[in-house]
Amino acid sequence: MSCEKLYLTAPEMLECTARVVSCTPNKNDGYDLETDRTPFFPEGGGQLSDIGTVYDPMQGFVPVTHCFEANGTVLHRTGKPFAVGEIVTLKVDAAKRLKYTQQHTGEHLLSHAYDVLFGAENVGFHMAGDVVTIDLDHNLSDEEIEAGEKYANELVWKNAPVRIFNVDASELPNLPLRKKNEKLHGEVRIVEVEDGDHTEMCTCCGTHFMSTAPVGLIKVLEHARYKSGCRITFACGVLALEHFTKENAELRRTAAALSVKPDGVFDALARKEEQVQGLNQKLREKNAQLAKLYSEKLHAEAQENFIAAHLPVDFDACKTIAETLCADDNFSAALFCNESDRLRYICARGKNGALDCRAAAQKINALLGAKGGGSPVTSQGSCPKTAETEQKLREILSEPVQNLN
């Protein structure tokens, strides 16, 4: 028995009664419900499935979490079974349907705009829960992206008529379709948007409005090169408002933190970046001075051109000190430092230094339970900083030559 697909013939009808044709268990511990008619749009053509409820007096409202088409009929995924032959009430989530229809009609308008203005063909369309993307076969500039967005929104504001009709596939070559598909056969659904000399016409199985105004707004969120063309991420209507509300809140929070107005955030961040760069430069200079002082001190304390020490510096400074010490061709060093919750080490030697840094790393790893390694010339690693590892380190440093050489 064929299913009457109200989402195609009467898309404004979001609720109806229907007779249960079948209800079979599925592999997801739920049931696939088939009815003789349905207002639910099944996922397809890039558009997400409707969700909603199915109601009967015995079970109340049972959620419909997904719909899909199989063998020409629509199956509704539910968590409870229904008896064959019983009459149920199907109700689509109106807010979700509005959001999805806004995205789909908006996608037609945006794709049409880039086709008319730049001859860019839509070669991919995907609707997710929070964004929509189209893939174009041309890589467009920022200015071209904005021009297409403006063109599409002007079509929305004109409240242009949208006409939906069916034709036989044999008639398709005679129609000014935006996209050609020679594989189609039988009856084909066409969605047409009036646009003067550039009428938008495309094959489509999705839900659409009867005019463009309900799309509300089309906003491009980002675009990037993709394969040989570009991928455009956008949102329409309710979804566009959700994005604006979230991003505006973030902008105002950032502006408040910087003590500026929202339109002054970029300049304020640029000033902060300049300040940070200046402070980083001063820090590098101080670290270099500190490394020089530690290097001189450690070099003086070394025995037989070798030093092992636990230093109160970060790992970058530790590496700099090791490099400075080992500028002496005959010198070797094993230096340790604390960084956050880890104990880190670096072993290094000059060109003629006696320390085998790879072997030293293996010994340190075994003693501290550390992970690391390297070459005979340099090695490094780390382990969690605990009372036990710090005690082990004190034991290593008490007889470094014996423990590391």
What are these regions (language model features)?
Residues 1-405:
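A glycine- and charged-residue-rich anion-binding loop/surface
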